[in-house]
Amino acid sequence: MGAKDVKFGNEARIKMLRGVNVLADAVKVTLGPKGRNVVLDKSFGAPSITKDGVSVAREIELEDKFENMGAQMVKEVASKANDAAGDGTTTATLLAQSIVNEGLKAVAAGMNPMDLKRGIDKAVISAVEELKNLSVPCSDSKAITQVGTISANADEKVGALIAEAMEKVGNDGVITVEEGTGLQNELEVVKGMQFDRGYLSPYFINKPETGIVELENPYILMADKKISNVREMLPILESVAKSGKPLLIISEDLEGEALATLVVNSMRGIVKVAAVKAPGFGDRRKAMLQDISILTGGSVISEELAMDLEKSTLEDLGQAKRVVINKDTTTIIGGSGEKQAIQSRIGQIRQEIQEATSDYDKEKLNERLAKLSGGVAVLKVGAATEVEMKEKKARVEDALHATRAAVEEGVVAGGGVALVRVAGKISNLRGHNEDQNVGIRVALRAMEAPLRQIVSNSGEEPSVVTNNVKDGKGNYGYNAATDEYGDMIDFGILDPTKVTRSALQYAASVAGLMITTECMVTDLPREDKSSDVASSPAGGMGGMGGMM
């Protein structure tokens, strides 16, 4: 283990503070409707331009290791806020910077850091309660549009598109963001359950003009096994042929004699049939087959459950109003499953999402949830250049997260007004001693920082505007986009309560740890000895001279 560089007390805190300020100053210029752009250099390709706080924070690494520790701790605030609510990263960074700066001034003046932290925590707990009281539900399309517009940096088209997507697939539906091919943003909605497996043979196609397979009111056979022997399938094929309905087979694989027999039967018109592979792999495939069986009201034929395909009957098959299959996807529309069973399955998947630890697992579970809930919406972002496309896509994703947060916990007045009102309501809060009172005042002062920065970025005087907003009541605030005062809700400037709450809680948590830091330890930079060896005349072969 190499030698360490250790710094104590004020010396350590000053270094850490310098790192905090470098990162926060780079991030906070993006805040508000008149926030500025930040250009990020990339090791290859064109530089990217962004107004997204967390994108800026992720790029920053400082040369001085002590300063870098400060910067990384604030980066953690931005990441945590982003993970919790999907937005509010710039606000969280700004709140953390303000608490750390004011808090360290108090520590330098001789205050007890632990009491300062207790005061800050007390103020934040009270502020969160007040935020909940100020919050109003966000359920109608107009409010969702407004939240989306604000979070997409005043892009009304994006706000309207997100509201339309939520209306079509529901608040729980999956909405994904993809890069489009044109200049305009587009919304594509897939109703029913769709999975990425196409037909196993083009001979199943019954709509040659569009190249798809379309089955009306089909039976659906689900098998968690490979099917290669046609004898296993004969009893069920005969039963389906008598019923006069088409059949969709979803199995791990279908090959050889079994596939050939199905193709021949389909082409001769004996049984209208199509076959696709089951989606996913391993345990995920088993779970998705189970989802399809619940959605269609059938059973999965599984050898693990001692079920035999040869003995299966029409009772084991699922049903749907319509199935559409192309070369890449299968869509099941109007499954005949019981609503209660589907709701129970949805509840089970929600529970799994809460317990999942990896982002990948959560994403896959959310996809399954949406497919059972009734649809997937795809927002296709259009732009003229690749640089603009990346910037726009990041903004649309932010706006989508913000609207979801708004639906979950409601909305408060935006533009930094909610935190100013909260600070006013808890201004009489007191701690157990004077040091805790100073901690409370540090937190209250920090709650004004977002409004001050929004005003500063728009080119006005922060103190004048902040005092005017403080003199007002309720939702009265400053609209930086139009440079006028009024009701923020009427202006359509809303913030999701969850975003504001998460930003405040995470900022106070990390800032409190930084204020109570007394020692910092990092590796000493190593001297590069390889250059000394390379410059020696023997080129690293010294010591061999005596062998002559």
UniProtKB/Swiss-Prot annotation:
Its main location: cytoplasm. Residues 526-548 are annotated as: Disordered. It catalyses: ATP + H2O + a folded polypeptide = ADP + phosphate + an unfolded polypeptide. ATP binds at residues 30-33, 51, 87-91, 415, 479-481, 495. GO terms for biological process: protein refolding. GO terms for cellular component: cytoplasm. InterPro entries: Chaperonin_Cpn60_CS, Cpn60/GroEL, Cpn60/GroEL/TCP-1, GroEL-like_apical_dom_sf, GROEL-like_equatorial_sf, TCP-1-like_intermed_sf. GO terms for molecular function: ATP binding; ATP-dependent protein folding chaperone; isomerase activity; unfolded protein binding. Pfam families: Cpn60_TCP1 (PF00118). It is found in: Cytoplasm. Its EC number is 5.6.1.7. Forms a cylinder of 14 subunits composed of two heptameric rings stacked back-to-back. Interacts with the co-chaperonin GroES. Together with its co-chaperonin GroES, plays an essential role in assisting protein folding. The GroEL-GroES system forms a nano-cage that allows encapsulation of the non-native substrate proteins and provides a physical environment optimized to promote and accelerate protein folding. NCBIfam families: GroEL, PRK00013.1, PRK12849.1, PRK12850.1, PRK12851.1. Belongs to the chaperonin (HSP60) family. This is Chaperonin GroEL. It comes from Buchnera aphidicola subsp. Schizaphis graminum (strain Sg).
